[in-house]
C-alpha cells in the first residue's frame, strides 16, 4: 500500500459513525522532515517547525512556552503523551501528532470533528505503523 493510500484511506476518511466528518488535513512525515504522503490541504511547513516538533518529542515540554507552529499557524500545546503524542489547540480546531519509530502522523481538524475523534484517527494509524516496525 502506498503512503498516499494510508493518508487517504486511514486519515482523511469519514470518522467512524459520523458520515461526512473528516480531518481537515493529514500527513505522514519522516523524522528527518521528508514528507512521505500528505493531503492536498496539509500546510507547507518550515524545517525549523519540524525541528521544534521533533525536539518536543525528545524533550517533552519544549514547545509549551512558545506553542507549536506548523505552516505558520500557532497551536497552543495541550496535554499529550510524553515522547509519543503531541496535541495542540487553536480556536475550535487543533492538531494531533503521533510519533512512530520512523515517522510522525499528523491530523489537523476543525469542528464538527472533536479533539477525541482526531486523536483516535491519528493514534490508531500510528499504533498500526508501530506494530509494523515503522
From Swiss-Prot:
- PTM (free text): Phosphorylated by MAP kinases.
Residues with the modification Phosphothreonine, per the entry, are 114
Q: Superkingdom, according to UniProt?
A: Eukaryota
MF terms (GO), sorted A to Z: actin monomer binding
Q: Which Pfam families match?
A: Profilin
Q: How does it assemble?
A: Occurs in many kinds of cells as a complex with monomeric actin in a 1:1 ratio.
In UniProt terms, what function does this protein have? Binds to actin and affects the structure of the cytoskeleton. At high concentrations, profilin prevents the polymerization of actin, whereas it enhances it at low concentrations.
What more the UniProt record tells us is: The variability of the residues taking part of IgE-binding epitopes might be responsible of the difference in cross-reactivity among olive pollen cultivars, and between distantly related pollen species, leading to a variable range of allergy reactions among atopic patients.
Put simply, this protein is called Profilin-4
Organism, by scientific name, is: Olea europaea (Common olive)
Q: Source organism lineage?
A: Eukaryota, Viridiplantae, Streptophyta, Embryophyta, Tracheophyta
Amino acid at each position: 500500500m502506498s503512503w498516499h493510500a494510508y493518508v487517504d484511506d486511514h486519515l482523511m476518511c469519514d470518522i467512524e459513525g459520523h458520515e461526512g466528518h473528516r480531518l481537515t488535513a493529514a500527513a505522514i512525515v519522516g523524522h528527518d522532515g521528508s514528507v512521505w504522503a500528505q493531503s492536498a490541504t496539509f500546510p507547507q511547513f518550515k524545517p525549523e517547525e519540524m525541528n521544534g516538533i521533533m525536539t518536543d518529542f525528545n524533550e517533552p515540554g519544549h514547545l509549551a512556552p512558545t506553542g507549536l507552529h506548523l505552516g505558520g499557524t500557532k497551536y497552543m500545546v495541550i496535554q499529550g503523551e510524553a515522547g509519543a503524542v503531541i496535541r495542540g489547540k487553536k480556536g475550535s480546531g487543533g492538531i494531533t501528532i503521533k510519533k512512530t519509530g520512523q515517522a510522525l502522523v499528523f491530523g489537523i481538524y476543525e469542528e464538527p470533528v472533536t479533539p477525541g475523534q482526531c486523536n483516535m484517527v491519528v493514534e490508531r494509524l500510528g499504533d498500526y505503523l508501530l506494530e509494523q516496525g515503522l
